[in-house]
């Protein structure tokens, strides 16, 4: 974050949240993706500050300087935390900015709270349709767990299963603690399509066409389901479109922030 950012810690929703505050103007809450921190999205926060906004950038619990939740949270609990932050900071009708996992929280928040507008960047929220090979792997994996326990016992089988899971799973999963692995497994299986029609805030979708984590097809579904949504597709950019194509991203982001809605 920039030198002007003030670091704050608050006990909210039963946990400690670290976040930064900078700038003056209408409030913007910036939410990072899974495995990232407030620093990952610092360039987004800077753009919002330069557009004349007061920007709150969070470290979600389990990332950066915010400790892990004591329980296995889902998107609901992370959203309740952001609702608590808004109340704590006396933020009314914020502008929400969410990248990847942060987009999940933004969708849930905006579906039930007054929101000035929302920007979703390569956002998660659409549960992908699984291929037959996926289900074969899942059920083979579940069956193999039972066999391994019978042959090797509980402790050794647990270690073997964990190694296999890390090799087969996503890098996000492999690099996470046991608690955060359980949370990741929970949140990635949450489909938010049923909430999207309830989002009343004008919404800008900014997406990389080469995003393989949350493909552009997800953006098109969101554009269709969110009543007042528009899509800016950045050709050739990946899951971090704001880093891959910073110039195009900043132009689209700033124009939407400054637009009279």
Residue ranges and their predicted role:
Residues 1-28, 50-53, 91-92, 126, ...:
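Alpha/beta-hydrolase fold catalytic core
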Residues 12-13, 50, 54, 60-97, ...:
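Active-site loop/oxyanion-hole signature of alpha/beta-hydrolase fold enzymes
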Residues 20-65:
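Conserved HGGG/HGGXW glycine-rich cap/lid loop of the alpha/beta-hydrolase fold
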Residues 104-111, 115-150:
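Flexible "cap/lid" loop of the alpha/beta hydrolase fold
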Residues 131, 143-201:
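Conserved alpha/beta-hydrolase catalytic His-Asp/Glu region
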Residues 199, 205-207, 211:
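Short beta-strand/loop motif that positions the catalytic acidic residue
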Residues 223-240:
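Catalytic histidine neighborhood in serine/cysteine hydrolases
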Residues 237-250:
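Catalytic histidine-centered segment of alpha/beta-hydrolase-like enzymes
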